[in-house]
Curated annotation (Swiss-Prot):
GO terms for biological process: aerobic respiration. It is found in: Mitochondrion inner membrane. Belongs to the complex I subunit 1 family. It is a multi-pass membrane protein. The chain crosses the membrane at residues 7-27, 46-66, 78-98, 113-133, 151-171, 183-203, 239-259, 262-282, 296-316. It is an enzyme of class 7 (translocase). PANTHER family: NADH DEHYDROGENASE SUBUNIT 1, NADH-UBIQUINONE OXIDOREDUCTASE CHAIN 1. This is NADH-ubiquinone oxidoreductase chain 1. Its EC number is 7.1.1.2. Its main location: mitochondrion. It comes from Dictyostelium discoideum. It comes from the Eukaryota. Keywords: Electron transport, Membrane, Mitochondrion, Mitochondrion inner membrane, NAD, Respiratory chain, Translocase, Transmembrane, Transmembrane helix, Transport, Ubiquinone. GO terms for cellular component: mitochondrial inner membrane; respiratory chain complex I.
Amino acid sequence: MENMLYIIIEGGLKSLIVIIGLLIGVAFATLLERKVMAAMQKRRGPNVVGFVGLLQPLADGLKLVLKETIIPIVADKLIYAIAPILTFTISIVLWSVIAVGVQSVFASINSGVIFILAISSIGVYGIILAGWASNSKYAFLGGLRSAAQMVSYEVALGLIILSIITYAGTVNLQEIMENQEKVWFIIPLLPGFLLAFISALTETNRPPFDLPEAEAELVSGYNVEYSSTGFALFFLGEYANIILMSVLLSVFFLGGIVSNKILGAMKGVGMLCSFIWVRATLPRYRYDQLMYLGWKSLLPFALLIYIGVISMVLIIK
């Protein structure tokens, strides 16, 4: 009985640490994005709330939460309420297997990579439910686009991750990092890194692949009918996934935190800055161009890379 109580308390504290850490990370990721984009566009960015604008995310979050929650009359109220909670919950669950040290992880799972692939594949359900429950044509089209986009690019991303698993000989995230003590995987698998980066942009609905929430076409897309806490949960889920993808790319190709925690954090921030750089640089793709790129360009190249990695491993052995 005491052991069970200890496990429950330990699990609750770990979950609380993950949630608080994630909220702080998302807050500063949004501030970093606004500062970097301001610098690229030769302007100041937020600099009024707090020292050099450091408290701006807190002010924005409080303003958003304190606003009135407006539920459309024609919406399916239960599913409308569940959708943002589901999206945010999935983004938190994904973080449970991310190591914060070589021997320090909240949920040590031997097949951590498979766990991430499985959970991330159901992340689209929150967006689809939001689009359907809002009973709005713009939200519904945004949900459909998101479903098609994630299915199209998860195949290519899955093949690249299979290539990493094959090359490393393990599906454990910590062991993948340990295998990069001498040589980072980005050196032998540079084409795979480029494809994984493009797929990560698409999976997180980031520009130039932000078709599900294209303002010019869908008036913010799947979350057009959401306000206050619902909108905030979608926002938190989206940025939590962006940070997760930045960390995963660092773990898979740059060695993660295997040598130094500070260096590992810098790698993750560097990947996050590359997401921001792409947003500030490239225009949005058309929907047909997005589908063409996914099925006729990325998928064949990902398959070739996977075959090449298998051949390389067989030759080495």
